[in-house]
Amino acid sequence: MLAILLLQAAVPAVPTDWSALAPLPYLTAPQMAPPLARFVAGEIAAGRCSLPRPADGHYVVKVDVATLVGADGSVLRAVPHAIACPTVEQYSVGLVLKFARANLPPRAGAADQWFRATIVYDWGG
């Protein structure tokens, strides 16, 4: 029990003001290929997300993911901002983890730090 409490104390809490977080410092910027938006489009079409249909049919869905990065450049924790669509939130976390794998600079001697990753899904309905 004491070990669990010590671990919780060592992990920085998720910040409340995500707008103040620096962008996730990818070594190579990830590319959002059009097929990545298909899953999101399918979730909306199936009614599993309560996002309104744009008048012009062009969807732009943004998901912020607070990402805790260790000094070695590894992701320690990723927390999606709620957009009323849990499957898309978790899908976005998976993409951030994939994009960050071996793609973040080590920060020797630095403390664990929170960053913000923003995933943007863009497609015509």
Where are each of the predicted segments found?
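Charge-biased low-complexity segments
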Residues: 2-125
